[in-house]
Amino acid sequence: MNEFTDKEKVMAAELARQDFYFFVRWMFLNTKGFKWMHNWHHKSICDALMRVYKGEVKRLIITVPPRYSKTEIAVVNFMAWALGHHPDSEFIHVSYASQLATENSYKCREMLLSGPYNEVFPYTKVRDDSSAKDHWKTSVDGRVYAAGNKGTLTGFGAGKKRDRKSTRLNSSHTDISRMPSSA
């Protein structure tokens, strides 16, 4: 694995907080131990998700073939990055198979528990009593719930309405905008 100076780590953590694309690459390097072989579509996916985060896009469909990192980027990393900015956010992840949804939720949870993530987002913590893979919470009652398409979602809401002006990030990033529940 690459060794970085403390100054480089601090600079990288700041950049990862601000730039979702850099966050994905930085977390991959620090959790997998080698550089991510990224391609143009990875940047496009990250840019599209940033438009969702900023509230510029209300619905997004990502159509790329299997094994092209869309789940790693749009589910695991995006939930982790958004929870880093708003630890009280609520996410529901549904997949065709409950086992896959649970695995993705677990990967996100493990990312939040990792040292590299805590260097980027030191104030976002998983609750100590939240060890389930498919339904877990942050220390400030944010949550991730995972289910298969035949799973039960009744009673599990996601998203929070926020005042965008009062929750600006570093004066340059607007708050997350959640899809309406009717979507």
Model-predicted segments: where are they?
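Contiguous, well-ordered alpha-helical segments that form the cores/surfaces of helical PPI scaffolds
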Residues: 46-50, 72-84
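Residue-level preference for the first positions of well-ordered beta-strands
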Residues: 59-61, 90-92, 143
